[in-house]
Amino acid sequence: MEELLIENSHRFTIFPIQHPECWNWYKKLESLTWTAQEVDMCKDIDDWEAMPKSQREFYKQILAFFVVADEIVIENLLTNFMREIKVKEVLYFYTMQAAQECVHSEAYSIQVKTLIPDEKEQQRIFSGIEKHPIIKKMAQWVRQWMDPTKNSLGERLVGFAAVEGILFQNHFVAIQFLKEQNIMPGLVSYNEFISRDEGVHCSFACFLISNYVYNIPEERIIHKILKEAVELVDEFINYAFDKARGRVPGFSKEMLFQYIRYFTDNLCFMMQCKSIYKVGNPFPQMTKFFLNEVEKTNFFELRPTQYQNCVKDDAFAFKLFLNDDDF
């Protein structure tokens, strides 16, 4: 029986802390708290309209993936991990992660509503799991490895790390290249905050695998899960580049193929496994971002002095209540 799944009938409160390392992970995640309305996307609208159509198509595919992916992550946390795991410090982490994933999901919805005014096109993106075969395939793969009736806790944690790491990482990289072009500051800011959060989520899964999981999956199983994730990313990249007619400034799909393999080898190291691909980093100029080392001070520098929202939709409008008279 896994320690993480054993009920302690004598423990009702979080204090005294019994698992200090897990508690430190929770406090780290707590320190990164932000809200979806704290990013100003007003300048992004003009940048988006000035962007070549092929480039916009590429980033639309990424947004279509993200609006689906975070919902599936939330689903796994609420229906599986948060019901099964009994170690309070770990449960606190996953409770905080679920809240963060809700912020991420809202943020991606705001991005779609801000950049894409046409409601039919918005709906096509929000329905990505139905409209894009590769996104549906990725969602099915995630649910397959998150199924507690078919996979051990260790296998599911490996799959979860692959989702938070491998499936998301190339999309983070692609958006971050917009910063080098000095465009889309709001989208880039969202990307930095979300990728930083996801980096902690992924690292925590690896920490649990290495330090708490008793029945650690065999290396061949870990490699199988990670390689399947890489193959899905390859398929998505090909699909997105086809939509963009092969033209995306800043990088080629071959560079993204190489990067995701470089990242996967680092994930292997974090899980104390042998590397699979043994390739170098094709984007050395962005190493700091790839290591999820966005400076925390930048988070506060990027916050607007007033909450702003460029979405022309009452359902997405944000109101800051200043006093009781506003209620």
Swiss-Prot record:
EC identifiers of the protein: 1.17.4.1
Cofactor(s) of this protein: Fe cation
Signal sequence bounds: none
Chain positions recorded as Fe cation 1 binding sites: D70, E101, H104
PROSITE patterns: RIBORED_SMALL
Assembly with partners or alone: Heterotetramer composed of a homodimer of the large subunit (R1) and a homodimer of the small subunit (R2). Larger multisubunit protein complex are also active, composed of (R1)n(R2)n.
Record-given protein name: Ribonucleoside-diphosphate reductase small chain
Species of provenance: African swine fever virus (isolate Tick/South Africa/Pretoriuskop Pr4/1996)
